[in-house]
């Protein structure tokens, strides 16, 4: 009764490692965890207080999310990216992972995934029946695809639609993309859609974190959330 593509999916590697480490801790073992992106810091008091204040809310929400919240996010992103956003450009969901999955389900085309990358991009493509392509990265280019490798891939079939996933700062390398300008030229040339996963964008300390959006805004969908920078996963 369950589709083969679901039955044949592996458990998320990060969640699997986390469960294994929990069992080892139950057995009295000391475990140093490198495989799970759970913040060790407390959720900021302001976030906790606002959640408490609104715990009584039970009405069905607007489809795109609370108007006031969308307006606040639009204002924040406008300052961050030096580009005017309005609330109509913002969609709220139960988590960025779920919103990414909806994008996979909605997109009619092929997915380009840098390797190495976050473990859930590929399974989401499989469930959505989207063909995916791995694009190799190296330490020489900060673990991001080069413009040349991207063009080589998409130029083989110019009539197809492609969705490129870019995650900066990157999971698992922690590196920041340095070649947005070069990538954007290929993105605009072939009209590639970009999913810019910016879940770690507020966790950069040495420099301002740039976005591919600043170079190719018309082609870019930005994804972010609360789970990393304020430790509010779930």
Where are these regions (language model features)?
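Helix C-cap/helix->beta junction micro-motif
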Residues: 24-27, 128, 189-190
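Short acidic capping loops at alpha-helix termini that bridge into adjacent secondary structure
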Residues: 84-90, 109-110, 160, 218-219
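PLP-dependent aminotransferase-like
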Residues: 105-166, 176
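Active-site phosphate-binding strand-loop segment of PLP-dependent enzymes
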Residues: 141-207
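Active-site PLP attachment segment
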Residues: 215-234
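Hydrophobic/aromatic ligand-binding patch that stacks against planar heteroaromatic rings
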Residues: 124-125, 186, 212
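Hydrophobic residues in well-ordered beta-strands that form the structural core
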Residues: 113, 134, 194-196, 222-224
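N-terminal small-domain helix-loop-helix segment of the aminotransferase-like
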Residues: 2-94
């Amino acid at each position: 009764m369950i589709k083969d593509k679901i039955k044949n999916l592996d458990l998320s590697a990060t969640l699997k490692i986390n469960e294994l480490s929990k069992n080892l801790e139950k057995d009295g073992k000391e475990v140093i965890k490198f495989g799970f992106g759970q913040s060790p810091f407390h959720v900021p008091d302001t976030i906790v207080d606002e959640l408490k204040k609104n715990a009584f809310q039970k009405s069905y929400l607007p489809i795109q999310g609370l108007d006031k919240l969308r307006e606040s996010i639009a204002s924040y992103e406008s300052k961050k990216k030096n580009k005017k956003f309005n609330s109509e450009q913002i969609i709220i969901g139960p988590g960025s992972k779920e919103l990414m999955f909806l994008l996979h389900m909605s997109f009619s085309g092929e997915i380009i995934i840098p390797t190495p990358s976050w473990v859930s991009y590929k399974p989401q493509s499989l469930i959505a029946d989207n063909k995916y392509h791995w694009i190799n990265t190296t330490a020489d280019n900060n673990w991001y695809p080069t413009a040349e490798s991207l063009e080589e891939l998409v130029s083989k079939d110019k009539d197809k639609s492609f969705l490129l996933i870019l995650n900066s700062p990157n999971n698992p390398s922690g590196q920041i993309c340095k070649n947005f300008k070069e990538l954007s030229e290929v993105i605009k040339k072939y009209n590639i859609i970009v999913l810019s996963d910016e879940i770690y964008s507020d966790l950069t300390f040495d420099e301002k974190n740039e976005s591919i959006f600043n170079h190719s805004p018309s082609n870019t969908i930005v994804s972010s959330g609360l789970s990393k920078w304020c430790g509010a996963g779930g």
